[in-house]
Amino acid sequence: MFKKILIANRGEIACRVIKSARKMGIRTVAVYSDADRNALHVRMADEAVHIGPPPAAQSYIVIDKIMDAIRQTGAEAVHPGYGFLSENMKFAEALEKEGVVFIGPPSPAIEAMGDKITSKKLAQEAGVSTVPGYMGLIADADEAVKISNEIGYPVMIKASAGGGGKGMRIAWSDEEARDGFQSSKNEAAASFGDDRIFIEKFVTQPRHIEIQVLADKHGHCVYLHERECSIQRRNQKVIEEAPSPFLDAATRKAMGEQACALARAVGYTSAGTVEFIVDGNRNFYFLEMNTRLQVEHPVTELITGVDLVEQMIRVAAGEALPFAQGDLKINGWAMESRLYAEDPYRNFLPSIGRLTRYRPPVEAATATGVVRNDTGVYEGGEISMYYDPMIAKLCTWAPTRAEAIEGMRVALDTFEVEGIGHNLPFLSAVMDHPRFVEGAITTAFIAEEYPEGFQGVTLPMGQLRKVAAAAAAMNRVAEIRRARISGTLGNHERHVGDDWVVGLQGEEIVVKIAADRDGATVHFDDGTSHRVTSDWAPGQPLARLDVDGEPVVLKVGKIPSGFRIRTRGADLKVHVRTPRQAELARLMPEKQPPDTSKYLLCPMPGLVVKISVEEGQEVQEGQALATIEAMKMENILRAEKKGVVKKIAASAGASLKVDDVIMEFE
């Protein structure tokens, strides 16, 4: 077994590999850029080597710099994680020449499967079901439009060397095919150093289901069942689960056997994932094979009990798999939610900055439930504009799907993140969505259920009244504390009344509080009531309450005359006032936001790739105005209405902050 391995990656996956290596008694070496000097993976590793400036193109994907770090530390093997150099054949070959073991598949398999055009041809030869499409190289946007018309819209435009949702576009028209081709080509060149593009038919209403395979160097190959990855936004997975709520045993077996057949056909060893799209009749088609560890591998580990990172290391060291196909049973259900530094209220635009608060739920493992959090950040650390915006992968396991979902709801409610925009509210909303709970999902779920983007969650009246009761009870605790603070008028003790008006979500709810030693009963003016008990104290950001015998978790922040309360995806300003205060508050004018309709503002921190118009030019609704690159993704900003460009304030190559002016209209 290896004594020392180097992890050619960063963030949560580097931390994840370090954990398994540490368990196996193997020393670890981290690499880091200037931006990651104080990163968690650097702190966790036994050794760390600096490899360059923040941009990945100058550090994490420079093969020579990784090779220098290997020579400097004497590492015997390298785990590439995912992304960066994980599917780079030249890197695997460089390691082989150096006599260093690559913890992954052999370079011919990487070459064959890393190229989506070649892999599709090989899949067909191996008897794997495939989607119709054009597998040749496409020279320019005109040819892309021509081929798209021959295949028939909609089509999927994809980078041959792509992955992770980068370099992928769905086109429904000639215009979208033309724009999508150029954006995919640019993203592919920036992310993978390979701008080749191919086009295939887009299967409407598909599910994205993938099979985890594991093969050793002794001829053994097994599949560790499937992962359902259909909850996606812009082809980037958001929520995954294992097993799939859609597959039956026969389809699962057929998909697993085809995945192993493909792995054997290319001489594959190590962990790999064969991705399929599955239609409503359970017909499945090969999508691609990822010759690396997947982001979502924890859900497979949770339902099989197999440490995939450990097995990758053991296979690389020449050991045989310790189990056969018949040993790999599905045990329970696992969910994974990807916590991203992106603002769901601003169309999921990337967010950067310092994590002023980062308190994940307590990790635990019992026979009835597991909470696991894979992360690469810590409180006080920074989220950089240079890398993927993922903060953490929150996973839950339980005996049933319903229990795993409920475990995830609670875990999300107790996850505290402040300082940056994040998608926790959106993840909570999906977990509560009836269609998700039912399992009736496709890759179009987010686009169909949130066509205007995420606008927040409106709580049903039953939940709203529980929040109102909790807020009233917490407000009473805060008021009593304020009444007892020293420095008030002598011989005067401020009275805390029982009658309050709770304002939230556009509603005013009149309540009367009857408090006792154990808690408070909050009475509503319609004769109903809620019993609230809690040990919450003013200033605590997380309130764990019991409302009518049921646990309720609220994230709590102080605002004038009340609280900011976040729960189950809802973000509420809850005002708790005396009846007189409520009467006066109704008379107060509301402050109007400034009018920015004549400006194109930068929606995220990023780099201006292109300004598509000129001063004095008339633009039409939907016309491309500028392209901003952030978190390795290109974002095209379009005109919201017809107008004339008065002034352009930014230029290509400029680095902008949120709300910086890009251009002004007449």
State what each model feature region is:
Residues 323-331, 447-450, 454, 488-489, ...:
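Long, charged amphipathic helices and adjacent flexible linkers at domain junctions
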Residues 592-666:
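Structured functional modules or segments
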Residues 77, 87-94, 336, 346, ...:
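Structured, non-catalytic alpha/beta "coupling" segments that mediate domain-domain communication
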